[in-house]
Amino acid sequence: MRTTSNAAVKQPVLRSGHALICGSMAYDTIMVFQDQFKNHLLPDKLHMLNVSFLVPQMRREFGGCAGNIAYNLKLLGDVGHVMATVGHDFGPYAQWLERHGMPREHIRVLADEHTGQAFITTDLDNNQITAFHPGAMGHSHLNKVGDAGHVALGIVAPDGRDGMIQHAEQFAAAGIPFIFDPGQGLPMFGGEDLRRFIDAASWVTVNEYEWSLMAERTGWNEAEVASRVAALIITRGGEGSVIHTGGERLHIPTAPARAVVDPTGCGDAYRAGLIHGLLHSYDWEQTGRVASLMGSLKIESRGTQNHHFTRGEFVARYESLFGKFR
């Protein structure tokens, strides 16, 4: 579905090269509490909370936004170069990247830090309590975009605050188009910071909640943000996504999942689809549909980097839902 407006947009020109993915890499420790949190929380005692949950199930996953995006991009046949800071415990993750053919020359290891760690406890209602230790991620500003060669486009995904600011500035100064994807890092920034990110970026992508916060802090509505970038992409969960580009408003439908197993990392899979479409010059409708299908394929598997498919399987699934794949 298309609607039109009179918005002006800046159209980026991509050089030949690869995607540079600036963002976090982390270990996700996921635990399952075999009950409901609400049965163990006293509403009148929340000011003096002291609880302990027995979690018989636990697993450790490779995660972080940059790692997840790179993994999904590799499934689509592209090689994304991750720029991130990690700690002395990165060895198992490094082996995982090597096994899957994902470069790590722009991943800086800090011997005195831990790799970012998320500790997630989920109850039987899929409510989550998460504690996150940023560790080495807080030093992401030590990495410089200029150290990476042959970059066609970049993405500034959730990372250390200073790193996100500096990488956006460095992409803009180098004339490299980039996606601003603030994600869960958005609350770190005030309105003036966000306005600068938007004005520097070529594309902006957020989910519905993040958009509400961005609009509130910047004072800009959808049309005002869309007029400053080549595309504003807002994902709306089960309602699909909306892409504002070239004065048009495109509605991208969801790709029905065969099973809903784990939504964690779906946003990163979606963003890999956006990058793939941009690298291969798809139109925005096809790019959005590729991104939508990536999110659905991810939701069918537990964890953020455990799903697999071949190129042929992806194209067949796409064509069964949306018609001819370019």
Q: For the regions a protein language model found, what residue spans apply to each?
A:
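Gly/Ala-rich phosphate-binding loop of Rossmann-like dinucleotide-binding domains
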Residues: 74, 172, 279
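Conserved phosphate-binding/catalytic region of the ribokinase-like
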Residues: 2-16, 219-326
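A short, aliphatic-rich alpha-helical micro-motif
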Residues: 14, 147-149, 198, 226
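Conserved phosphate/ATP/ADP-binding segment of small-molecule kinases
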Residues: 165-252, 259
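Beta-strand->loop->alpha-helix junctions that form or flank phosphate-binding loops
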Residues: 83-88, 105-115, 230-236, 253
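Glycine-rich phosphate/adenosyl-contacting loop at the front of the ribokinase-like
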Residues: 2-81, 92-95, 325
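Active-site metal-binding loops of divalent metal-dependent hydrolases
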Residues: 25, 159, 269
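Conserved phosphate-binding/catalytic loop of the ribokinase/pfkB sugar-kinase fold
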Residues: 105-110, 118-162
